């Protein structure tokens, strides 16, 4: 039997961050858990919240680190080890400043683009070679600090679009699990 895939939604814990741009990964992970009909439980060895199940006929471990974004790797790496998931079978769902708001892109490896959550995961795993579901939040307006921008709630014009974007990102994640990176890229990047 094939080892599971590890699907991690990045975000920050706590109600203060729940509706911020930086928490899109958590929002999509919550949606995927709902599709599985399961509730997150704390994984004792890693401290992350996890759900196990099947997406697109594939065994998956869905996780949300319970630490702050810039420390995500300290919970993701132990999960990968516990479930014997190599980095290439890790999918990280995260917000992306370098994509227009609502745009979804799939990627394998590469740089972190200033994303501290990705940096932490790559450092803890010792490699950048893992899959990513990138969800565009766009660049901040004017000279606003990106670190401030990602921790703000979505703007009034953005807010109504967030549920649809999360649905599309969840669909993209399931497609990635089902058919693999290149075929999924061909379909998702045409949306």
Curated annotation (Swiss-Prot):
UniProt main location, coarse: cytoplasm
Keywords, sorted A to Z: Cytoplasm, Hydrolase, RNA-binding, tRNA-binding
Top-level lineage group: Bacteria
GO BP annotation list: protein quality control for misfolded or incompletely synthesized proteins; rescue of stalled ribosome
Catalytic activity: an N-acyl-L-alpha-aminoacyl-tRNA + H2O = an N-acyl-L-amino acid + a tRNA + H(+)
Cellular localisation: Cytoplasm
Residue positions of the active site: 22
Function: Hydrolyzes ribosome-free peptidyl-tRNAs (with 1 or more amino acids incorporated), which drop off the ribosome during protein synthesis, or as a result of ribosome stalling. Catalyzes the release of premature peptidyl moieties from peptidyl-tRNA molecules trapped in stalled 50S ribosomal subunits, and thus maintains levels of free tRNAs and 50S ribosomes.
Assembly, per entry: Monomer.
Name the UniProt record assigns to this protein: Peptidyl-tRNA hydrolase
UniProt source species: Mycobacterium marinum (strain ATCC BAA-535 / M)
Organism lineage string: Bacteria, Bacillati, Actinomycetota, Actinomycetes, Mycobacteriales
Gene designation: pth
């Amino acid at each position: 039997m094939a080892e599971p895939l590890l699907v991690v939604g990045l975000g920050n814990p706590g109600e203060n961050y729940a509706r911020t741009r930086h928490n899109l990964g958590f929002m999509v992970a919550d949606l995927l858990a709902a599709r599985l009909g399961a509730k997150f439980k704390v994984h004792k060895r890693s401290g992350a919240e996890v759900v196990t199940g099947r997406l697109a006929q594939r065994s998956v471990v869905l996780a949300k680190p319970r630490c702050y974004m810039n420390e995500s790797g300290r919970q993701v790496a132990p999960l990968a080890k516990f479930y014997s998931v190599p980095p290439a079978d890790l999918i990280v769902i995260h917000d992306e400043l370098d994509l227009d708001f609502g745009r979804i892109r799939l990627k394998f490896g590469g740089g972190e683009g200033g994303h501290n959550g990705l940096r932490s995961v790559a450092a803890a795993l010792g490699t950048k070679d893992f899959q990513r579901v990138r969800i565009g939040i766009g660049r901040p307006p004017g000279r606003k600090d990106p670190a401030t921008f990602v921790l703000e709630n979505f703007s009034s014009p953005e807010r109504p679009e967030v549920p649809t974007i999360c649905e599309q990102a969840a669909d993209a994640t399931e497609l990635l699990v089902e058919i693999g990176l290149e075929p999924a890229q061909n379909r998702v990047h045409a949306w």
